[in-house]
Amino acid sequence: MTVPTPAAATTPTLHRAWAADLDPATLYALLALRTAIFVVEQECPYQELDGRDLEPRTRHHWLADGGTVVATLRLLADPGGVLRIGRVCTRADARGRGLGHRLMDSVLAEVGDRPCVLDAQEVQEPFYARHGFVPAGERFVEDGIPHVPMERRRS
């Protein structure tokens, strides 16, 4: 008999918080998940922390299942009033359950009609296209991974 892991046991709960309102344990869990995905899983031995997680206008969104963070993203305020979605990731054992789409729906409800951009890993371009994002610039390679800048067009 297989015992379900927390990531497969229940429907995760959606959370969001401004950087200043995050308790240290939650911030640690968000950063640990991102490091597990972007540094370890994707084999990118580059600095994951960029200083933007604690900016006053940074909003973190995450899904927790049984107290375990299973997916996260952050919303940044770039110069000129443009919002930027980034660091979107889901635990490997929680993928295929639509959690990334839940996070995107949550953050885009907050964004509303304001301009919004992101830099997608090329393999994730169709995922973001489902949320109204289109390519918006020259493709580039970051940390050895091809990326495409994307923007959301207002409806």
Task: Please report, for each region that a protein language model flagged, where it lies by residue.
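Short amphipathic alpha-helix that is part of the acyltransferase structural core
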Residues: 2-55, 60-68
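Conserved acetyl-CoA-binding loop-helix of GNAT-fold acetyltransferases
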Residues: 90, 96-109
